[in-house]
Amino acid sequence: MGHSACSFQMPTLPSLTGSIDTKEGLETCFVLSYYARVRLVYNLLPLLRQSPRPRVLSVLNGGKEKALHEQDIGLDQRWSPTAVINHTTTMTSLAFEHLAKENKEMTFLHSFPGLVRTDIFARLEPPESSGVVWRVTLAFIRGLVAILMLCVGMPVEECGERQAFLLTTDRYGPGAWRIDASSEQVITPGVLERYREEGWRERNWEHTMRVFDTALAIGSESVSK
């Protein structure tokens, strides 16, 4: 088997209308940004282990890890757009460090692409119940972001080239890496230092496996009905 690489580049933003759940009871943005990506990697591990140069890349928010709500890491009780971003970011880095520890021949890359010139913010819509002030505020934010993207945003083509570089370069060997918008390693551990010491790589992985088991059980029940 030749060179293997998994790249996930699914830009997502949390809903402004509140938590929108899948049929398994999981919040949609959480699924797209974390659970679905990790599940795909998990399912592909047997193939990746046969590759001479296995590499996994998740384009999300590497290096921007924040503290978790440690008693509610699935955000069943404390969901908010900011919490989803923070949790999926930190949990991705913890999951990749766990996977790298268990698969010492693999490279796991969690990258932050920076501000890229896409229409992701332009597609933000206010809740139907929003008042005039919130609608005007959101329109202002969309306009401001559009200007920022035009002035300092990275072209989509360059962003794609940078991610392709990460998948093919020899700079980042086996292990778990956090990569910034300049395609450089993020060295400062931030909140990860404490989480490593407290065993959160394993605790996060155990939580993730429980979520998978529950989701698969619900899916099986739906199919059998």
Where are these regions (language model features)?
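Rossmann-fold NAD(P)H-dependent dehydrogenase/reductase core
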Residues: 1-126
